[in-house]
Amino acid sequence: MNKKNIIIIGAAGRDFHNFNTYYRNNEEYQVVAFTATQIPDIDGRQYPSELAGALYPEGIPIFSQDQLPELIKELQVDECVFAYSDISYEDVMRVGAIVNAAGANFKLLGPNSTMLKSNKPVISVCAVRTGTGKSQTSRKVIETLLEHDLKVIAVRHPMPYGDLNAQRVQRFATVEDLRKHNCTIEEMEEYEPHVARGNIVYAGVDYADILAEAEKDPDGCDVILWDGGNNDFSFFKPDLAITVLDPHRPGHELKYYPGEVCLRTTDVAIINKVDSATEESVQIVENNIKLASPNSTIIKAESKITVEHPERIAGKRVLVVEDGPTLTHGEMKLGAGTVAAQRLGAKEIIDPRPFAVGTLTETYNKYQHIENVLPAMGYGEQQLKDLEETINNADCEAVIIGTPIDLSRIISINKPCTRVHYDLDEIGNPNLVDILKDFIQEHKLVKKTACVTQTN
């Protein structure tokens, strides 16, 4: 039997999961390469044999996506599998055209081929775009379940930017664990808000192994929470699917892959940030939910912002630092830091571009929609150095940190700074407390010691 030669087109996340679940032990296929994009410096590596399995004793090479047409011809590729997220339909089909023009088939794997089934109840928190507020939603879900005396284990969508073997299964229980695993800023932004609240987070590369460890976590496990990445759908089959939408990008819920998959398969659709969006934009999003997911429960929510030192913003010339991926491939022009600056009466939000150095100059050149805000890029040591130098070069009176982590703990900032925190605050009913109360009863998770609370 002739095996089909496969290239998996990815960005160090969904691509590895698709391989592990669908291709690793499938003798009908030979995965000859991965390609990589979106994340700096991940091409030129190898998916190691220890993870690739017995059919791949040499491992699998990772190339830049730019080389795709040549690779298809040189490696006699039959099919290319698209496996990354937060990308417009136009760009997905452009990749498809490149693949077809080189002679290969173009393929997308769906949930039935890639989702793992847990022996614990699973709640997934996903989104239609990156930067919609998944993390604050996940925190709200966890905190609500904890009030019912339930043990919740969060499992985060992968961000394996380092040693893949060492990152096969990662467990984070303390901030020190983040240092132990040499986490990038992007990883810390997702893990730290959980562990700072005393919650356990798992992540890594092999999600079958991760799920098995999470289910038997030494601290106990009643519920698995899938904490999604970008706008990808869950790696685990959910018993309750929650999808977050952003009225600052109305219409994107029907235009970006695979966010529309999340929307069409969701049980609960949360329209976040309604306090900072126009009524017209909120209505567009609500109409699209009713069109694509008519049976889902719609919840509207504010992204409630609190500032540690508001006096450092009012009347000051400020530099705003925001979450990197939200601004870059998420295509946002602002975030919580910008909203805080506007609400608290900053004298001026400065343009950071004249002060940018190194890799940040490249980021601004690539993502030209980013203007009066600095993306916190920190995938590697050089980017961290460039971020620190850019902030310290800036002609401003204060720095607003709108990232989920405390940047001043990671880099040295030579100006007064203040952090912005943001939390999900639902408006009216139904809300997450109502939804989760039903979930707890349905899965017979009620404990005698639980205290039931009602918010809003």
Show the residue positions of the predicted features.
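Conserved glycine(s) of the Walker
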Residues: T132-G133
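Phosphate-binding P-loop
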Residues: T114-V122
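Phosphate-bearing ligand-interacting subdomains
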Residues: S49-N112, L384, N393-D406, I411
